[in-house]
A protein has these predicted regions:
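Helix C-cap/helix->beta junction micro-motif
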Residues: 30, 102-103, 174
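Structural motif corresponding to alpha-helix initiation and N-cap regions
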Residues: 36-39, 89, 93, 140-143, ...
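Short, acidic loop-to-helix structural element flanking the phosphoryl-transfer center
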Residues: 79-107, 117, 143
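Conserved phosphate-coupling serine/threonine residues in phosphotransfer and NTP-handling enzymes
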Residues: 11, 109-111
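N-terminal helical cap/lid subdomain that shapes the substrate entry/recognition surface
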Residues: 2-90
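Asp-based, Mg2+/Mn2+-dependent phosphohydrolase catalytic module
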Residues: 1-2, 64, 113, 117-205
């Protein structure tokens, strides 16, 4: 193994408490098209592609309104997270520091452009990562973005760490082992490794 690629939401942090207010501030200007969201609502869609999030949270909105709501929510999300951050899981920096001494670290997340940068900006963790990617920049699926990062950085034997079924499928698409973060937001049908807290990676690798 030469590298570890991380999902972000439900794997390294939980941003929902920070962003729920911003989401509802945007939604309030679309009376009738969308209902306020809760932390539980947001945790239930974490890790999904942005268009799918819109369909699940705002099923009654027409396509044009839904797109506008999502665009504004995504912009608000990046702004709020860059100013306030999210809730990091226990020992995140300690774990990243230890792992980065042995492996190259990366982030591939199903988020909009600017989201990973907001995570970096507030928490100052970018020094531990070599590269990152998301569909907001590439328009690609998570599995394709994992492959892109692998090719761009000449990775031979990475693993992918994530918390939902989509992460498992993306790792499978990329042909690499999947580490299931069971403390995150979802359940998966299978995995190669499992951790019940982030620092479990130090015992695995």
């Amino acid at each position: 193994m030469d590298s570890i690629i991380f999902d972000l939401d439900g794997t390294l942090w939980d941003p929902t408490e920070t962003v729920v207010g911003g989401w509802n501030q945007v939604i309030s200007s679309y009376t009738g098209a969308a209902k306020e969201v809760t932390i539980d609502n947001l945790q239930g869609i974490m890790g999904l592609p942005v268009p799918e999030v819109g369909r699940r949270l705002f099923p009654d909105a027409d396509e044009e309104s839904r797109q506008k709501i999502m665009d504004e929510c995504c912009d608000m999300e990046c702004l709020v997270l860059s100013q306030q951050g999210g809730r990091l899981y226990a020992r995140v920096e300690e774990v990243l520091q230890a792992l980065s001494a042995k492996y190259k670290l990366f982030i591939v997340s199903n988020c909009q452009a600017g989201y990973i940068e907001a995570f970096y900006e507030y928490h100052q963790l970018q020094k531990y990562f070599t590269d990152y990617e998301n569909p907001g920049r590439t328009g690609l699926s998570k599995g394709e973005n994992i492959r892109l990062v692998m090719d761009r950085n000449h990775l031979m034997s990475p693993v992918y760490v994530g918390d939902i079924e989509g992460d498992r499928k993306a790792a499978g698409f990329a042909g690499i082992p999947f580490v299931y973060a069971s403390y995150g937001f979802g359940e998966v049908s299978s995995y190669d490794y499992v951790i019940d807290r982030l620092d479990g990676l130090l015992e695995l690798f």
